[in-house]
Amino acid sequence: MSTIKVIEVYTQNGLRKVRPYYNRRSAFVKGRWLGKLLIDVLVSEFKLRPRAYYLDQIRKGTYRLIRDGVPLVPDHLMTTIIKNHDVLETTTHKHEPPVKQWCSQEVEAEDLPGRIAGFNIVFEDESILVIDKPSGIPVHPTGQFYQNTITELLKLHGVDALPCYRLDKITSGLLILAKNSQSAGEIQKSIRSRDMIKIYLARVKGRFPHSELILDNENAAETTFEDTSKVTVEMTPIYSIDPKRQFPVGLSTSKDAITKFYPIRYFSHADETVVACKPITGRTHQIRIHLARLGHPIVNDSVYCSHITKYPERLKFITQFPRWENQQDLDAEELKVRFQKFVDETKNNCRTMETFCPECHTVDLKDPVLSDLELWLHAWKYEEINGKFKFKTDLPKWAQLDNS
């Protein structure tokens, strides 16, 4: 259970911000905690802070034990062991990162026909809501994000809906949300069984294969994948690298992946191509990685575009070793050394300030750069092969003929 005080939202420099707020959460204690002191549990379960920090927080009431509906006083917590049915109550000072402002606060507040919370509605009935997700905002609560997420914003406008699939924070486009668990299950089943045709758009570096055969007109996008001679297929495996986790857990197993690509238009002055992308499998960052391996990364991809990447060691590894398990020169020790490089470059990109929150002493984070909150990758079409539904958004501005 979670209790949140009224939050304050404001916009600044193109960002939607939430002022830090207090959040109180409560849950029954875990079985492995029984018979232990609260301070010992906190130190062993949450190792990021020293023992002295948790002692101070217990005295301040940040962590409390509720027994038979009555909170134990801090002094008693130092000597009282945890019992079955105790409830741990935690009060935290939440610092949410800002997200990209997608509309004015006035537009966000007033729902007009075809819009909710400032998001364009593609389709809505009693079972589902389909919106055109803007880039720069997470779909659902994750990590430090909670209030600044699409599902929580929709709740403020009377819609409690579940996302049917994942769209990254910086990706835009079609987002199908189910208003009940049955609808969510049906759509997710279609996706898992590959009964769903998904087409994304991306703007990439260079002249993509077969782009010399396309006609630059507004209708070019409507004929994607009709001419099989223009299709490029990338079939290299996909794995993820998570520097926040220790090696070897942070390096996932390679999994087979297939993406088909089709050029739509070529912008000669910029030497960039808009391509349609049809992922047959659904691996994390699959389209982005496959485009990078083809030598045509997404133009503004700060992870997988070699011209602007903030993570050159990670990018080099992913492009050089499509299936890292098969490389004889990558033994456990070499992998550990390389993984440490991934960790180091991630730390170097952490945008921290030299100031601390006066209430909770959390290190303040610098505002993100607006350009880092947008990726020229857009979920454009979703179609159920049995004809149950077919949804499509307008072309994003960067894919339009007059936005070259």
UniProtKB/Swiss-Prot annotation:
The record's EC number reads 5.4.99.42
Active site residues according to the UniProt entry: 168
Gene3D superfamilies assigned to the protein according to its UniProt record, in alphabetical order: Pseudouridine synthase
Biological process GO annotation list? Answer: enzyme-directed rRNA pseudouridine synthesis; tRNA pseudouridine synthesis
Summary of the function given for this chain in its UniProt record = Catalyzes the formation of pseudouridine at position 31 in the psi GC loop of tRNAS.
Short name of any one Pfam family annotated for the protein: PseudoU_synth_2
* First-level EC class: isomerase
Into which family does the record put it?
Answer: Belongs to the pseudouridine synthase RluA family.
Name of protein: tRNA pseudouridine(31) synthase
Tell me more from the record: Present with 377 molecules/cell in log phase SD medium.
Subcellular location(s) of the protein: Cytoplasm; Mitochondrion
User: Which keywords, in A-to-Z order, does the entry hold?
Assistant: Cytoplasm, Isomerase, Mitochondrion, tRNA processing
SUPFAM superfamilies, per this entry? Answer: Pseudouridine synthase (SSF55120)
Which GO terms label this protein's molecular function in UniProt?
pseudouridine synthase activity; RNA binding; tRNA pseudouridine(31) synthase activity
Protein's UniProt keywords contain Oxidoreductase? no
Q: Which reaction does it catalyse?
A: uridine(31) in tRNA = pseudouridine(31) in tRNA
Cite the InterPro entries for this sequence.
PsdUridine_synth_cat_dom_sf, PsdUridine_synth_RluA-like_CS, PsdUridine_synth_RsuA/RluA, RluA_PseudoU_synthase
Query: Cytoplasm among the record's keywords?
Result: yes
